[in-house]
Amino acid sequence: MKVSLIGAGNIGGTLAYLIASKKLASEVELIDVNGDLARGKALDVSQTLPLIGYTMKINGSANMERIKGSSVIIITAGIPRKPGMTREELIDVNAVVMKEVGEKIKKFAPKAFVIVVTNPLDVMVWVLYKAAEISPDKIVGMAGVLDASRMNLFLAQELGVSVADVKSLVLGSHGDSMVPLFRHSTVSGMSLPELVSVGLITKDKVDSIIERTRSGGAEIVALLKTGSAYYTPAASVLEMAEAYLLDQKKTLVCSVMMRGRYGVEDDIFSGIPVIMGSGGVERVIELDLTPDERRMFENSVAATRKLVLEARKYF
C-alpha cells in the first residue's frame, strides 16, 4: 500500500518515520514544494529501515504527480501558527495551498482516502473537498483524536492514574469552540460526573482541564516560538490512517461532512464520532446531546460556517 504525505515539515517527517516504524505501508511519498527538504527527510527515514528490519520505498519529491496510486493521502502542507496567532488567521494563506493540492488530487489520485491536518482544520477540509470533488466519506480532518489525547493526559495527571484508563470525547471544531463532553468522558469506566460526585476531582478542576484542552495547541506554540505541535498530531493521524488501511472499524472523532448529521443541513465539516474502516467514514454515531451540549456544538459549527464564508471566495 502507498501513502503520500503532502508537506515535509515536522508533522510530515514524523509521519514518514511512524509509518515506517509501524510497517504500515510498502511505499511512502514525501512531497513538498521544497523538494530537497522532502528528499532529505525521505533519505533520513530510509536509513532507519535496516534498524527497523523492514523493506519499503520512501521517496522525496516536489512532484505532485507522484501521488498516483496512493491508498491514503495525508496533507500537512501550509503555514503553521506562530505565538499569539489563532488557527483562523491562517485561512487566506492555507486556503490557496489546499485548493492547489485538491486540484492535484482530483487529477492524479481521485480514489484515495484523504486526511487533512492543515489549520484552520475544519475550513481547510472544506476547501480541499470542494477542490478535489471526492466522495464526502473519503475525506476527513484530524480533530477530536488529538484534542481527546490532550484531555486524557491532563485528566490522568490530575487524578494520578494511567493514561490508558482515561477516555475523553471532544466534538466540534478543532479550535477554541471545540466541545469536550464532560459526561461522556470516563476514567476506568466511571464518568467524570461520577468522579466529581465521589470527590475524586472537583468540577472546577475539570473545567480548568477543559479550558487547557481548548488552548493545548496554543500552549505548545507559545513554548516552541518557531512552530506548532507535531508529535501528537502525527500520532493522531497515524491512528486514523491505520483504521482505514487495516479496516479496523474503529470509533474515532474526525472532522467530517455534516450535511444530514446532527441536524446540520449544509456542507460544513466538524468533529463527530464515526466508524472508520476500509470504506472511509462507514457510519456516524449520533450522540444524544443535552440541550447545553447541543447549544455548544451548534455554536462550534456556526463558528466554522462563518470561516467557510471567507474561504468561498476561492471558488
UniProtKB/Swiss-Prot annotation:
GO terms for biological process: lactate metabolic process; tricarboxylic acid cycle. Its EC number is 1.1.1.37. Substrate binds at residues 81, 87, 119, 150. It catalyses: (S)-malate + NAD(+) = oxaloacetate + NADH + H(+). SUPFAM superfamilies: LDH C-terminal domain-like, NAD(P)-binding Rossmann-fold domains. One of its GO terms (molecular function) is L-malate dehydrogenase (NAD+) activity. NAD(+) binds at residues 7-12, 32, 94, 117-119. It is an enzyme of class 1 (oxidoreductase). The keyword tRNA-binding does not apply. Keywords: NAD, Oxidoreductase, Tricarboxylic acid cycle. The active site is at 174 (proton acceptor). Belongs to the LDH/MDH superfamily. MDH type 3 family. Catalyzes the reversible oxidation of malate to oxaloacetate. NCBIfam families: PRK06223.1. PANTHER family: L-2-HYDROXYCARBOXYLATE DEHYDROGENASE (NAD(P)(+)), L-LACTATE DEHYDROGENASE. This is Malate dehydrogenase.
